[in-house]
């Protein structure tokens, strides 16, 4: 009687985690392979997936709520972005609004701190 792939899969699916771990180790020894995931460098899709797995280094500063002290928040938005008064006012009043994109982590956290101290709600994406 020949064993089919389905029989093998059924047998493996009934193993406990410990038994499965031992089986993987035996496969590695017998066939000289490793069960570690392979990192593929190259294409844009692979690069994006690898970047997502690592710690994020660039952030978008998104103002989700201008808060009660809108004048203070507008002043900070103008200082951070270089926007004119009308544009900064619109950004604060029409939330959510992205204030800056692709900002370094330290700069993004500092901007978030300043805006939150003025009463605004901010997300780093």
Curated annotation (Swiss-Prot):
The entry sums up its family as follows:
Belongs to the bacterial ribosomal protein bL12 family.
Assembly description: Homodimer. Part of the ribosomal stalk of the 50S ribosomal subunit. Forms a multimeric L10(L12)X complex, where L10 forms an elongated spine to which 2 to 4 L12 dimers bind in a sequential fashion. Binds GTP-bound translation factors.
Instruction: Note the Gene3D superfamilies from the entry.
Output: 3.30.1390.10, Single helix bin (1.20.5.710)
Give a short account of what the protein does. Answer: Forms part of the ribosomal stalk which helps the ribosome interact with GTP-bound translation factors. Is thus essential for accurate translation.
The protein's matches in SUPFAM superfamilies, at most eight in alphabetical order, are given as:
ClpS-like (SSF54736), Ribosomal protein L7/12, oligomerisation (N-terminal) domain (SSF48300)
Cellular component (GO) terms are: cytosolic large ribosomal subunit
Gene encoding it?
Answer: rplL
* One Pfam match: Ribosomal_L12_N
* Protein name as annotated: Large ribosomal subunit protein bL12
């Amino acid at each position: 009687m020949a064993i089919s792939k389905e029989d093998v899969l059924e047998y493996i699916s009934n193993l406990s985690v410990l038994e499965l771990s031992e089986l993987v180790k035996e496969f590695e020894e017998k066939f000289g392979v490793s069960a570690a995931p392979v990192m593929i460098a190259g294409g844009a899709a692979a690069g994006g997936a690898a970047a997502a797995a690592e710690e994020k280094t660039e952030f978008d500063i998104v103002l989700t709520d201008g808060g009660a002290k809108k004048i203070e928040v507008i002043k900070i938005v103008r200082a951070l972005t270089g926007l004119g008064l009308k544009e900064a006012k619109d950004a604060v009043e029409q939330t959510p609004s992205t204030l800056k994109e692709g900002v370094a982590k330290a700069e993004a956290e500092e901007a978030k701190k300043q805006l939150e101290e003025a009463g605004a709600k901010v997300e780093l994406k």
